[in-house]
Amino acid sequence: MACATLKRALDWESMNQRPPKRRRCNPFGQAGSNAGPASPSRDGPSTSAGLPHTPSNRFAKDSTEPSPFSESSLAKMSPDKMAESLCNEIKRLHKRKQLPITSSALERMQDSESSGSEMGPESPRRPDSPQNLMRHGEKALFTFKQVQLICESMIKERENQLRERYESVLTTKLAEQYDAFVKFTYDQIQRRYEAAPSYLS
């Protein structure tokens, strides 16, 4: 009875070895995007995968330091302060002839400012209020362009205050960094002179 045998090419070749496959050709520039996750090495798992990601000391220090703008000298805009600034801006523009409003509208604004609330159509009138204000209570005081002019002036003033505050803080920080740099340079120079060998040594 005859039997057929198959001879292996190499004696040390593994019996369960998979046949070699050709590597797939990837277009240029896509080799990194199509690559799979990195496999652990044979010696052991990689240290980068086992250790958690921690920020550097410099960034950790910056995150713990309080921001110089947290306690800014600029007070927050409360509704009362905003109303006061708005009335002052209206009076200033009226004096400069940039806000043409009637005297009755200006008196109405001052009356509403002293009363503490705007005189609306549904709000109760004070007993000492003039009759013309009660009659023309629903009439608008300013047009849209006038309101836009007032808001632009207030925003510009607030922007100038914030810019001055930012520049002062930035100047202080730059001065501190310069002083630290000068001190570090001086210490390095002193160490070099101290470590330099003398003639007697």
UniProtKB/Swiss-Prot annotation:
Q: What happens when the gene is disrupted?
A: Homozygous embryonic lethal; early to mid embryonic stages. Embryos display a range of somatic body wall muscle defects. Embryos show morphological defects in the heart, such as abnormal spacing between rows of aortic cells and abnormal patterning of the aortic outflow tract.
Q: Which residues carry this modification: Phosphoserine?
A: 39, 41, 67, 123, 129
A GO cellular component term found in this entry reads:
nucleus
Compartments (UniProt record): Nucleus
Q: Which InterPro entries match?
A: Akirin
- Motif Nuclear localization signal at which residues? 20-25
Question: What GO MF annotations does this protein's record show?
Answer: transcription coregulator activity
Recorded family membership:
Belongs to the akirin family.
Any extra detail in the entry?
Answer: 'Akiraka ni suru' means 'making things clear' in Japanese. The name is given based on the presence of the clear nuclear localization signal.
Q: What is this protein called?
A: Akirin
Q: Which organism is it from?
A: Drosophila melanogaster (Fruit fly)
Gene symbol here is akirin
